[in-house]
């Protein structure tokens, strides 16, 4: 969470509901970042990249990678993933009604490789920390 010296001219992204109801299995989302574009020998991108990935169900994510509900999994399609250098970058659910309606689902965390078939990346679930986030931004 950042505190700006002056108000931004850009509207902030919507935050998810605390109950996690914005996240459901197989929903399309978009991950963006400047990480490497090929793994393992790629270089960080000079331009912002994005790719559409599907969110996994909680049980499938836990069974595959042993994570709890403070995390979520997305991806698993060959060649489409976040990668090295993308940590902290956004996972966004686009609702199709313009940027003002998009929801921040997660922040890129970790994975085993990049863009491997049937192997998702793990994201910090924003809704898991939403009460804390809201308490900080209201100050």
From Swiss-Prot:
GO terms for cellular component: extracellular region. Residues 1-138 form the Peptidase S1 domain. InterPro entries: Peptidase_S1_PA, Peptidase_S1_PA_chymotrypsin, Ser/Thr_Proteases_Immune/Dev, Trypsin_dom. Disulfide bonds join 61-73, 83-114. The keyword Kinase does not apply. Pfam families: Trypsin (PF00089). One of its GO terms (biological process) is proteolysis. The keyword Ion transport does not apply. It is found in: Secreted. Secreted effector that suppresses host plant glucan elicitor-mediated defense responses. Targets host endoglucanases and inhibits the endoglucanase-mediated release of elicitor-active glucan oligosaccharides from P.sojae cell walls. This is Glucanase inhibitor protein 3.
